[in-house]
Amino acid sequence: MKFSKKNIFLLLLIFHQPIKSEINLSDSDLFKTLTSHIYLKATFNQQTLSQGILRQVEGKIFASREGKFRIEYLEPLNEVFISKGNQLIKYDPLLEQLEIFPASYLLSQGIVNLISLDLYSLEKYFQIVSCNEIATKSSCKIIPRNKESFIKSAEIYLQKNLLNKIIFIDNFEQQVIISFKDLSHHFFEDTIFEFEAPIGTDVIYHSKDLQ
């Protein structure tokens, strides 16, 4: 079953870094912790529950605090999302189609900003509602300040001070669960954010300014 475009952008995950053990989440230092690492690389599993139907997809994510990210979905989507901060591109190999969105589109996506915005921007676009810690597990609930965001709320879960999963509810009352593994914050080359569509690919611009 094909994922809707809005649902795909929602997942853009949220992917992020470990919480330092000396930081108490109840002190609302979550955003400082999220921005304490420049690079993030991980694999993920996304489950979407909508009207009793469960859909799953796996993928890989690369992200940089310089406003860049790359998300690669495996079967059945096989889609690629890349942003260098100035625009967002989506490539669908099955449709042989490349879509280009303006940077302003990213701000409405909510969760995707957690992987690329700086501390000032995170505090501007998100609000921490509450945080809880039990033994080696902790979680924080956040909500977007932007009323046009596609999400209503999100819960960030950590285990042994590492990002474990994120659960969020979108404006269509769908529950999305993103589980992470093989998380790394090691340096990687910016070439991962480069993309050149195959010859013959249809290109769709979602803003006249991008043409």
Where do the model's predicted regions map?
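An acidic-aromatic
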Residues: K60-G110, E173-I177
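N-terminal secretory signal peptides
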Residues: Y39-Q51, K60-F62, K68-E72
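Sec-dependent signal peptide recognition
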Residues: S4-L10
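Flexible, processing/modification-adjacent segments and terminal tails
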Residues: I23-T48, L54, Y91-K152, D209
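Gly/Pro-enriched, hydrophobic low-complexity segments
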Residues: L119, E123-Q127, N132-S207
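Short hydrophobic/aromatic-rich beta-strand segments that constitute the beta-sheet cores
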Residues: A42-F44, F69-Y73, L88-Y91, I142, ...
